[in-house]
From Swiss-Prot:
Protein name per UniProt: Large ribosomal subunit protein uL30
Keywords from the named record: Ribonucleoprotein, Ribosomal protein
Subunit structure: Part of the 50S ribosomal subunit.
Keyword Ribonucleoprotein: yes
GO cellular component labels: cytosolic large ribosomal subunit
Amino acid sequence: MQAIIQLRGPVNMSGAVEDTLAMLNLHRVNHCALVPETETYRGMITKVNEYVAHGEPSVEVLSTVLERRVESENSDETVDETWLEAHTEYDDFDALATALIEEETTLRDQGLSPVLRLHPPRGGHRGQKHPTAEGGQIGVHDTDQINELLEAMR
């Protein structure tokens, strides 16, 4: 499972990239989507690589982000562990995060919004417009790097 975070806005973005971001449920900057690791999604991520940060997060960090940022798909109810127990197959955020990483379920299957609306990173971006190879935030991240970014945006 990959976490994809849109970091750049729509200025000078081609229509094909904009459509691909929409297919990934990324409509605004600082939104995050969780997608399975399939060939189709790999191609989509490659196409939008200059506008997003992506990588596989750890269970602990994903659990923290879900606890703070997950929303119900159909209502304005606050999602907490009580809500999770009553409306999903999982008792807590750790179990949900584990199932998401192992690709056993999706947020939408559990009645949750497929988009996590994140806070801008505390402390700012490290060279937002540059690829990770040049010390920036755009592109592929290893687990530690994506965890650091998600923690800053929790």
